[in-house]
C-alpha cells in the first residue's frame, strides 16, 4: 500500500493492509474474479473512504469493488504533525492467483 507522505498512516480495522485485502476478498466471494486490481481511495479525517478508483478488471467488476471499498468500515485516519488529515491511498489486490 502506498500513501501520500504523512507521519501516521491510516489503518483499516485490525490494523493491517492484509486485513483490508482479506475483507475485500470476502466481500467478493463467489464473484469469480481473477487477476490484479489497483484500488485508489482517500481516507478522510473521520475515517471514511471517499474518491474510490478501481482499475484492472472489467467495468462490472470494477464497479462492484468500488462499492465494496466505498462502504468499508471506517479506518483510523492518518495524521500529520499531530493533526488528522485526508490521505490518498493506493494498493494492488490479487484475486484468484
List the predicted regions and their residue ranges:
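Charge-biased low-complexity segments
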Residues: 1-97
Amino acid at each position: 500500500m502506498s500513501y501520500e507522505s504523512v507521519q501516521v498512516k491510516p489503518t483499516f480495522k485490525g490494523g493491517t493492509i492484509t486485513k483490508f485485502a482479506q475483507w475485500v476478498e470476502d466481500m467478493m466471494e463467489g464473484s469469480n474474479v481473477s487477476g490484479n486490481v489497483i484500488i485508489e481511495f482517500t481516507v478522510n479525517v473521520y475515517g471514511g473512504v471517499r474518491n474510490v478508483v478501481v482499475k484492472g478488471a472489467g467495468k462490472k467488476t470494477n464497479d462492484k469493488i468500488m462499492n465494496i471499498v466505498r462502504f468499508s468500515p471506517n479506518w483510523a485516519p492518518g495524521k500529520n504533525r499531530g493533526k488528522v488529515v485526508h490521505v490518498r491511498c493506493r494498493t494492488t489486490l490479487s484475486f484468484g492467483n
